[in-house]
Amino acid sequence: MFITYLMKEADVADLIDTTEMYLKTILELEEDGVTPLRARIVDRLGHSGPTVSQTVARMERDGLLHVMGDRRLELTDTGRARATEVLRKHRLAERLLLDVIGMDWAQVHDEACRWEHVMSDTVEARLIELLKDPSVDPYGNPMPGMGGGVAHSAELAVRSLEVGALTIERIGEPIQADAELLAAFDELGLRPGARVGLSAHGNVVRVAALDEAGDVSGYLTIPMALAAHLFVSGQ
């Protein structure tokens, strides 16, 4: 099976807590090695520049972040603690939805975006116990406070001319946010732990699923910008 995917804008209109959404986005940008800027929030969430600037200014007044001289957004201790809490609840919700409820892998991210804002600390603690303190979410991303393995983006791998079989370690938020793309990944077995081959073709990256013999069983192509959020290792 061969799939070509074109990037589309994220649909975040139904998320219910803008402050928490921005805090989580900043933390995710840091996690992906991307400098947190207002422009990056515009890219991630699809909000207008003026809306993002107004929200960031309010968050700075509330003591959740600082806008540095180089325009970088730096979370305060209070902001980081709250961002970590929201991200942890989000990833616990994803594990619950997949492992216990049995929701489709491609759908759990969108649903967890709603749960993260309404989950109480009591429920969070019970989920940690119920799920046996999971170390990663369904897309290979570590629970906040837990270190992850050494991995780099598929974009970096192809730009550095890395060849041979690679392993998907984790899938970043911009890919998770599109259920259609995730479904295409899932159909080809492209989950964390899957063996893949990568190749650049202009401004897109071909991600080839490899079978046990190392042969290509199918592939999809994604924009280079999205490949930056597919993290792989040589293991």
Model-based region annotation:
Residues 60-70:
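A short, conserved structural fragment
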